[in-house]
C-alpha cells in the first residue's frame, strides 16, 4: 500500500474534516502517500485529485463541512462511469480509497470494489441511518444543534403559551427527532417508523393545557413532513395558537462536538489500518464503544431496526 485517496460524498456532516485529518496523518505516519479527491465521486470522475500532507489538514478538526467539498453524483449508477472512476484511480497510482459518506456513498464504494478497487467506508451522515453502526459521524453534533433550537423555541412558546412544531431532518430514520425529543423534553415525537394518531395528539395537547402546561413542543421528522399543515390543523382543532419551524440545513453545519471529533478520529485511524492489512470492501463502525470493521455487503444488508425502548421512554417522560 503506497498511496491512498480520501473523498467525501453525499450530504455533508460535522466531523468529516476530523475524519479526513485522521486518515491523512495516520497514513503519512505509516509511510503512505495520501491524495485528496474533491467533490466526491464527481471529482473522481473528472480527476480532481491533489496531494495532501500534514499541513493540508492543519486547523480543520474544529471546522464543520468538508474541506474536500462534496457533491451528489447520480451518473455513478452507470457501469461505464464507475469503470472510468476505477481507471482514474489507477492512472493516479492510488492503491486504496477511503469514502466518507452515507448509504449512497457506500453503494458507490461497493461497486468500485467489484472493479478491483480497495475501498473502506466511513459513516458520515447526520441521520444516523446506517444500522450496522451504533452512531454515524455528525449525528451527535446535529442533536446538539437541534437541542439548542428546542431550548430557544421553548422560551418563546412559553411566553406566548403556544404549541411549537419543530421539523428536523430524517427522511427514513427518525433518530434525530427521537433523540432530540427526549433530550429536549418534547411533549410529542413524530417519526416515520411509527405512525401517529392526530386526534390523540390534540387530546394530549389539551390535557396538558388543563394540567397547567405553558407550552407544548412537538418534534416532527421530515420523513413524516408537513409541519406547516399540521400546525394549521392543530390550531383549528385545539384552539391553541400553533407555530411551525423547519430547521433545515442549519442541522448540517457548525463545529463538530467532542463526541463526533473523537468518533471521526478513531474511525479514520481504523480505516488506514484496515487498508494496510490488505482488506478491501470494508466499512468502519462503532459497536458498544468499540471501533470495528465489517464487510460492506453485510453492512448494507443489515435491516434497519427501530428503537422501541427509546420511543416508549419519550412517551413516558413527556406526560
Curated annotation (Swiss-Prot):
UniProt note on regulation of activity: Allosterically activated by ADP and other diphosphonucleosides, and allosterically inhibited by phosphoenolpyruvate.
Binding site for ADP: 21-25, 154, 185-187, 211, 213-215
Cofactor: Mg(2+)
Disulphide bridges: none
Record's subunit section: Homotetramer.
Identification of the protein by name: ATP-dependent 6-phosphofructokinase
Stated family: Belongs to the phosphofructokinase type A (PFKA) family. ATP-dependent PFK group I subfamily. Prokaryotic clade 'B1' sub-subfamily.
Binding residues for substrate: 125-127, 162, 169-171, 222, 243, 249-252
Entry's localization field: Cytoplasm
Enzyme active site: 127 (proton acceptor)
Entry binding sites for ATP: 11, 72-73, 102-105
Reaction(s) this enzyme catalyzes, per UniProt: beta-D-fructose 6-phosphate + ATP = beta-D-fructose 1,6-bisphosphate + ADP + H(+)
Protein residues bound to Mg(2+): 103
Any GO molecular function: fructose-6-phosphate binding
EC class of the enzyme, as a word: transferase
